[in-house]
UniProtKB/Swiss-Prot annotation:
This is Alanine--tRNA ligase. It holds the Pfam family DHHA1. Gene3D superfamilies: 2.40.30.130, 3.10.310.40, 3.30.54.20, Bira Bifunctional Protein, Domain 2 (3.30.930.10), Threonyl-trna Synthetase, Chain A, domain 2 (3.30.980.10). It is found in: Cytoplasm. PROSITE patterns: AA_TRNA_LIGASE_II_ALA. It catalyses: tRNA(Ala) + L-alanine + ATP = L-alanyl-tRNA(Ala) + AMP + diphosphate. Catalyzes the attachment of alanine to tRNA(Ala) in a two-step reaction: alanine is first activated by ATP to form Ala-AMP and then transferred to the acceptor end of tRNA(Ala). Also edits incorrectly charged Ser-tRNA(Ala) and Gly-tRNA(Ala) via its editing domain.
Amino acid sequence: MQNLDVREAYLNFFKSKGHEITPSAPLVPNDATLLFTNAGMVPFKSIFTGEVPRPTPPIRTSCQTCIRAGGKHNDLDNVGYTARHHTFFEMLGNFSFGEYFKKDAIAYAWEFVTQVLKLPVDRLYVTVHESDDEAFELWARHIARDRIYRFGDHDNFWQMGDTGPCGPCSEIFYDQGGEHFNTPEDYMGGDGDRFLEIWNLVFMQYERSADGKLSPLPKPSIDTGMGLERVTAIMEGKFSNYDSSLFMPLIDEVAKLCGKPYSYDSGASYRVISDHIRSVTFLLAQGTTFDKEGRGYVLRRILRRAIRHGYLLGIKEPFMYKLVDKVCEMMGGHYTYLNEKKAAVKEQVRLEEERFLATIASGLELFNEELAKTKEIFSGETAFKLYDTYGFPLDLTADMLREKGLKVDEAKFDELMSEQKARAKAAWKGSGDKSSKGDFKQLLEEFGENKFSGYDELERQSKILALLDNDFKRVQNLRAGESGWVMFDVTPFYAQSGGQTGDTGEITGVGKVLDTQKFHGLNLSQVEVGKQIKTGDVLNLKVSDARAEIARHHSATHLLHAALRKILGTHVAQAGSNVEADRLRFDFSHPKALTSEELEMIEKFVNDAVASSAAAKTEIMDIEAAKNSGAIALFGEKYAENVRVLSLGNVSKELCGGTHVKNVSEIGAFFITKESGVSAGVRRIEAVCSRAALNLARGFRSELAEISNELKTNEPMVAIKKLKGEVRELKDKLKNIGDSHAIAFTSINDTKMGVAVVKSGDIKTMIDNYKNEFASLAILLLQVNDDKIAIAAGVKNAPIKAGEWVKMAAKILDGNGGGRDDFATAGGKNVPMIETAVKEAFEFAKEKLLNA
């Protein structure tokens, strides 16, 4: 039975037992305490804790994609070196929320293992908690008593945290055979590999209080987990997950790419790559992007670890992106979004590979130099330089050292990292998030969530349910001249959410509404009052005219999203947005900058849609029905059971709770004002419509008139072309003066970057001239005079600090220096090292620009 059969067999088995199949939740959970979804129960956590009501039906089954890399649950270091550690894996599970309990859970598990998987009974063993006589006796109905083992809390008691739901658990083990495993640890309860845990059944029957006391839950629940990779290996008679059909096709592809056959004993690098490409593909397909911190940095670490293992196999060029096709081929049948995102994922992987490969050789050279001097502990300073200059994550350096039996000075690395973060934040001042300490829980318990009526009305009379000061503490009144927050029973003011800014307006005869925000489900308006108001007052509310402009920009954002997916491809996914009365901003997944032709096509698409005068239509639909109708939902967004669906003619259909136009013609004109990069794989478009677009056009007309007046012509383009010709002639003359000043620039992320040695001239003046020529520039020049080296760097609109740049170059040349972030100078004296300094300075800047 192959892996697809195991997955489908499991889900279909529990479907036949009345369980509803729940699709795999996103790898990025809606849970601030977790980096990634790392277990099958994570999507159901709020149900187990009672934060949300139990679903109907209250029994579910799923095959959940999981990642364990970074944070508390981190398997990264072991991946490739053991038979069963993975960063990415699939967890099969069945769940009961206060419905069936131990008897049925045990019976279902036994039936599936013996009747569906047909595992031999004489290879199966079971463990229970030492105090769980009930589970022991229930198992004894199915399996011999001498095959049931009792263990303590460490092995057979599960809890979500220090407090909350918990209970004993029971595990099913598979005996892989004494003929294959016969170490002293190969016994039930030992640390050997002979007895392999394949299924864990958690009996959530207690609530643990802060004092450690266990109290029975009124409705005990079931949470189970079975690793697809382990079961697949067993079904195929393999002793390592990597030898199964889940991984061997990927390992075979790696062997083709490096031209070397795979063998298990020396194949750690093959296994690392085959595991890591699964994590990388799924995370990118679900919208995570490479970044300098958080989840995006974990993603970068995983890929760079794989690239380095490719380097060990002799692969010195981008190759990981080529494996994306195989992952999609193997898993796209069940996870169909992989096929839709494949092209974009490949491009993002390829670009990230190029970034790292640009510095890996220099980084490895530095690593090996330090390694030669290391006896036990590798320098933390060098590890930090590898991270900061060459893009080597700390765990990659530690991984390389582990192969040599050495360790890195993590304490020193952490110290340097903390110093860097402190410098970065030195200028920041903030008051913290006062809203986190507000009296919201009390308001929710007393009133529940208040209603928003602004879809249908912009004016109404409403009653004050509660007042809060600006620290979000409850007060009975606000006096004349004071400001604070108001909770109305029903409010026409839209609270900021989904990228749409909050409404403003007025309270007739009382004061102004400055902002509207949503806190813990409560719609609260910030007000400034001219006379006293108190709890219980009934007031006249009016939303400002800005609402209409906000609605136009919000609807234009939907049309823009549709245009991007139509012109660039369906891989485009929203990565963020901001909608205001005079502008919109839309962030989206796309691997490279848009061309001027693409921007023109997008702008035309939106304006053509506006000209169609199509009606806007909103419907309230069941979430699944909405998705099935073709409505676009944000990946990973948590939606209610019933959702609001907005259709703009036949052009756009999305889930959206914001406010919109009645007809797309209200949008008027649409202009794109800027396209830029946000991070690796994420682009941003800024645009205007309606009155803001008209104001922009008026501004252009005024500027054109001013240019015509300055050039003293009614045909400014003719004059401009003439001037451009004259400039071109002057440049040619300058170029002919001599090429000693010529700089070969490289374009990286829209920045011109160059490092060069010049023979003559004033290097500061040269830098100033280049700053005037380019919108975004990073340049470092060196000049030798009488065995001394002058260094100068200039930076304009680029993520490099000139002071740091000249310092690193000067250090190589036995000198020093520094200066501002935009301009700095230094000196050196080691002339024979000047070529090395040029190379290192170039790589330093390249890494900074590529990872910006």
